[in-house]
Design a protein with these regions (language model features):
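An active-site-proximal structural segment forming one wall of the substrate-binding cleft
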Residues: 1-35, 39-81, 102-117, 224
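Short linear interaction motif-like sites in intrinsically disordered regions of transcription factors
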Residues: 12, 43, 64, 93, ...
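Hydrophobic beta-strand scaffold residues
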Residues: 29-31, 197, 232
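Short, solvent-exposed turn/loop segments enriched in Gly/Ser/Thr/Pro and often Arg
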Residues: 34-37, 132, 233-241
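Short secondary-structure boundary/hinge segments and terminal tails
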Residues: 40-41, 208, 242-243
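Extracellular glycoside hydrolase catalytic/binding regions
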Residues: 61-77, 84-230, 245-251, 255-261
Length: 264
């Protein structure tokens, strides 16, 4: 972006190119504001941040431009306002309600901008995050769905590498009770109230030495999510969590992939 917060036209063209790849394959595509948030970003959730109004204005200008650029795309293109927005202390959970309310405010800004746009945007499906996209009970409880001009077009997304010690490779064991607990919270806080939920990121770091255990974990995770009607998206980052080699289009862990596809 330039000094006037205008997105580089070549960048938008590249995003469009990738979006078109996805849609041309008959898939649904999600665009979000990604690493503008997080530990290395510029947009933070701090209630006492003197820079917030400037950050919020920049956030709004991004979505005004993106909404207009893609306004005539079909409902197969979904917008997601944020990704794992943190405070400046980089806390991933256990933050105050006031901090979560900053995220709620940004989510409302996002919805308002898209709905005031033209084309297919007034009815487009929009995805929202909790603080840090956290599946912790406190952050989910302090999340508030924005007001919208149309019904049943908002979806909550959380990220859940659960249990984190296993998913990050720190431990080679896990407890299914950890998975049961956070999904039960998702159900009680949102799904029972007819709010749709997706797990926008999940996964486990890959290596063949514990492939059987990881396949077992993924199978249980997805089966549990399926009982609540939750769709899950593996975080294939091309790095530690990758399950597909993008250079030669081959599966790195076909046993794991086959097991997940069987559940899905």
């Amino acid at each position: 972006m330039d000094s006037n917060n205008q997105i580089d036209s070549s960048w938008l063209k590249r995003v469009k190119e990738v979006v078109d790849y996805v849609l041309d394959d008959g898939l649904t595509c999600i665009i979000n504001v990604h690493h503008d948030t997080g530990t290395k970003g510029w947009l933070f959730a701090d209630p006492d941040d003197e820079e917030f109004s400037k950050e919020e204005s920049k956030f709004k200008k991004i979505w005004i431009q993106v909404a207009d650029y893609f306004k005539d795309y079909s409902e197969k293109l979904i917008f997601e306002g944020l990704n794992e927005i943190l405070n400046k202390s980089s806390n991933w959970n256990g933050v105050s309600k006031a901090t979560c309310d900053i995220v709620n405010q940004l989510n409302q800004d996002f919805v308002d901008i898209i709905r005031k746009s033209t084309g297919n945007n007034p009815t487009r499906v929009l995805v929202l995050n909790t603080y840090a996209a956290s599946a912790a009970k406190g952050e989910m409880t302090n999340f508030a769905f924005p007001a919208d001009t149309i019904k049943n077009k908002l979806v909550l997304s959380v990220h859940a590498y659960t249990p984190y010690s296993f998913c990050s490779g720190e431990s080679d064991t896990y407890k299914v009770s950890d998975i049961d607990s956070f999904m039960s919270n998702l159900n009680n806080i949102f799904i029972k109230k007819w709010y749709p939920v997706i797990i926008g990121e999940f996964g486990v770091k890959g290596n063949n030495s514990t492939l059987d255990k990881k396949t077992e974990w993924a199978t249980y995770y997805l089966k549990k999510a399926k009982t609540y009607g939750i769709k899950c998206y593996w975080w294939d980052d091309g790095g530690s969590y990758k399950i597909i080699n993008r250079h030669n289009n081959t599966e790195l862990y076909p046993t794991l992939i086959d097991a997940m596809m069987l559940v899905a």
